[in-house]
Amino acid sequence: MSSAVARFDVQDPKELIRIITEVVIAHLEGGGAPVAAGSAPADVAALIDHTLLKPDATRADIERICHEAARYGFASVCVNPWYVPLAERLLRGSGVKVCTVVGFPLGATLPKIKLAEADQSLTLGAREIDMVLNMGALRSLEDDLVEAEIRAIAELCHRAGAICKVILETALLSQHEKVRAALIVKVAGADFVKTSTGVSAGGATLEDVALLRATVGPEMGIKASGGVRTLSQLHAMVSAGATRIGTSSGVKIMQELSGNTG
């Protein structure tokens, strides 16, 4: 965390984290300015990562979500690495990016394996990588390891012209751990911090999104994932600070927006 410490007159990284955490939580308790959530269909669609990460997803399922994503103009489709080549072929020229996951869903894969997984996915056509942070290392206070792993994948993504998002799995972390993790992700150079895998017991909450926004500031991306199934939930997450929504309910949300729920 030396790059973060250099910006403050604090020598101990743990003390730096403690100070920033207290400031962030105090800011959150005092309320913050909400982010406006537009309702134009193109604006809403551009927020959505159309997601299908179920282990039993078939080629037909992937074809369906790719066609849906192209029809509505979603930001990306998020699929397991096995389906990256198929999604890339189906979406080529559509403007919809292919997103995939690394170290999913536990985040406990060895760093070199995560890096290789990201590298091959990028080679196959992924342009957004959602990697899972090593929660065990984070909770064991091995911040240097966590930062190094994220930095390596973020730099790999950026060399390929791709985006790196880091999943925290907020449902498993304390408030202080969420803040610490988000700061590490920011210092490591990732583009987004993401709340959840959607596999664990809890998904995105408004409180967590607001906490992450207060932590990383106004410029960094925040992806809310897990449990966002309606237009009102999407707007609430954006108002709390999310700039991307991971959901398998993208079509339902767009139909709700147009008044067609049939």
What are these regions (language model features)?
Residues P34-Y72, W82-I222, T230-E256, N260-G262:
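Alpha/beta enzyme core
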Residues M1-G38:
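Protein-protein interaction and targeting regions used for scaffolding, dimerization, and localization
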